[in-house]
């Protein structure tokens, strides 16, 4: 899938790079595709906007969406499709504080990203504090449920 996205972005004359674990982002890139597991946190500091995968394709509804909290903590604007089953409550919370935005198709995503290219990254310390508290509460609830099972 990464190669297909790379080809489409290149056809649109967007400066695009595929990154594997440990590689640096080349200067002037407009789209960066990270093709490695467990390294996203390293790159979030360099991103204004991100798109969460597995959220636009209905066929992936049973495994839809990825956890957006780390990107939110880094101050990224987060776009996602309608299928965020795995993290529905988190997306609702982040939407209320204007960090996530649901998009319905790739054209809408493209329009949002083009708009974002013209802005600077805005890190809202109050929102990040809210996100951290929210994450801590999730951890506490999860820990309580695990203790019940032990």
Protein language model annotation of sequence segments:
Residues 1-150:
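Nucleotide-activated sugar donor-binding and catalytic core shared by glycosyltransferases
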